């Protein structure tokens, strides 16, 4: 079966010091310090984690995990397999693994794939900074991210390379990897950082984008105006 470990109802700002969330690594088979509130725990045979209302770090184990961050600014690391990562309210960071992932910046219904935008003040980031291959990333379908599933697509944040069919909803910002990436914004104001290598960054329909080339000979294009463009080191066209 699919088992869930739920931390959502126990930790509050009044019960812990400092105000930090849980840290769970499902790949860890030994004892791990999840939180001072819980002490040391050994977590075995668990596929799904519900985070607290604070700033959590939750890492999967390659067993088709569903990871909910809950409220707070969370980091969700899918590792591998076919994961569902749900950030919840807050500015969250997602790292998909090798597989077919579905990532929701805000909320998620178990009955379908449509995310629901409930928090307009936070910003979510999809992080490819550990990916070595080139990425083609298109945010232009409203506030969702669509991947063109080419052989150059890598979601793995460590050393392995994964090529999955990935769907991402309600994520505003993107950070490229060390490959030559193509990153296209949506119709809202995005923050897009190409990272290393020779990237193509296109602001698309949002007004007031922040477009950062990073290192390499980059091509950066705004569209509607009001964009902040940073070429970085040894950049070409801006």
What are these regions (language model features)?
Residues 1, 42-45, 54, 122, ...:
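Short loop/turn motifs at secondary-structure junctions
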Residues 2-38, 95, 99-162, 208, ...:
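GD-rich hexapeptide-repeat beta-solenoids
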Residues 4-6, 48-50, 57-59, 66-71, ...:
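Short beta-strand elements of solenoid repeat domains
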Residues 18-19, 43, 80, 131-132, ...:
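Short, well-ordered coil/turn elements that cap or connect secondary structure elements
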Residues 39, 52-56, 120, 164, ...:
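Extracellular acidic loop/turn motifs
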Residues 42-48, 162-173:
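Signature of short aromatic-glycine-proline-rich micro-motifs recurring in repeat-based ectodomains
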